[in-house]
């Protein structure tokens, strides 16, 4: 048997982290078993489905590297198939036409609620022969009257549901459009899906779908339902918890494999291992180690993993990902150091690529914004003479290398009997505008000689103006 899994999102909004984890687990299971992973777009909600959401799903999957072997298939392109199967079920007596009005169904529901009963269809049209006479009707499934629906969920174990708890669900609405529970069964059957891995909000649908599979004499897939992901406050993950769309994590500067590594550990474990390459995930993944407990999304843990990969990945690969952030900021990368060199000095100092871009823009701009507190603290008249001497020493350098730059700084600090920081910090503020940067020698080396000298001269003018104002 070839394992075939699927990811079947609805294009009614963004691709959220819960959906991404479902896609990841389905993808990993297929890859682990040398199977196939199918992408299906469940776009039957015509009012809420948008092409923008479809594109966001495709872009998110591509960014994460979750390549699919087949698809994307679209449910809206399969309506003829759903109608064909519905007519087959009608012909075999496994479905029936129902002409109950909305008013009757609403009255039935209110009466059942008043009697503290579970709202369900009462089978009013079940045994009537209703021809297609032009009166609007829906097509309902003739659910078995008795018996138990039993299945083994790979996460939750054995589940048993009495058929008396299930009513005759609608397969096709009066406008001819299929319902979710009907379309998904036909799709999984036609696409030969062997394992359905999805959120546990679908557990209640599973007994109904199993009855449909059996009515069609179709093989019933294996089911695995994944627990929900919550925010750290124990509530359902939403916008108030921060980013929820997968592409928002790209904007936040999270590396795609860092996000995958984080998500795979939300509800799945392999011993005590925390760090997984994508290949290690594929090699190790199974469903028996998926937890039934809900998971909490922790941004600190995600950023810890992200920083790990910023430091351990090749500088070239991190630089390639970082380039997108500079482009979004409108920064001309031709005006500064090679991004690989920037990554070498900044990767350990930042939790994300977005932060790395934000704190490194002074390397690529002609002008800088000064932090006024840093200027007030470090660009004081007392450092005017040492910085003037340092300016001349740096200007005279033939080789603009970090070791030569550091020699100049050391010599001037000795000449004026100053602690090294008393020279380095004013110099840092002079060339970056703030009191934080990589080591001062590397900062100047990456800035280049012309930019460093020009900014030091501008800072000296600031200090002179401040001294004359005293």
Curated annotation (Swiss-Prot):
A motif ('KMSKS' region) lies at residues 236-240. Keywords: Aminoacyl-tRNA synthetase, ATP-binding, Cytoplasm, Ligase, Nucleotide-binding, Protein biosynthesis. A motif ('HIGH' region) lies at residues 9-19. It catalyses: tRNA(Glu) + L-glutamate + ATP = L-glutamyl-tRNA(Glu) + AMP + diphosphate. The keyword Ribonucleoprotein does not apply. Its main location: cytoplasm. One of its GO terms (biological process) is glutamyl-tRNA aminoacylation. One of its GO terms (cellular component) is cytosol. Belongs to the class-I aminoacyl-tRNA synthetase family. Glutamate--tRNA ligase type 1 subfamily. NCBIfam families: gltX_bact (TIGR00464). PANTHER family: GLUTAMATE--TRNA LIGASE (PTHR43311), GLUTAMATE--TRNA LIGASE, MITOCHONDRIAL-RELATED (PTHR43311:SF2). Catalyzes the attachment of glutamate to tRNA(Glu) in a two-step reaction: glutamate is first activated by ATP to form Glu-AMP and then transferred to the acceptor end of tRNA(Glu). This is Glutamate--tRNA ligase. It comes from Legionella pneumophila (strain Paris).
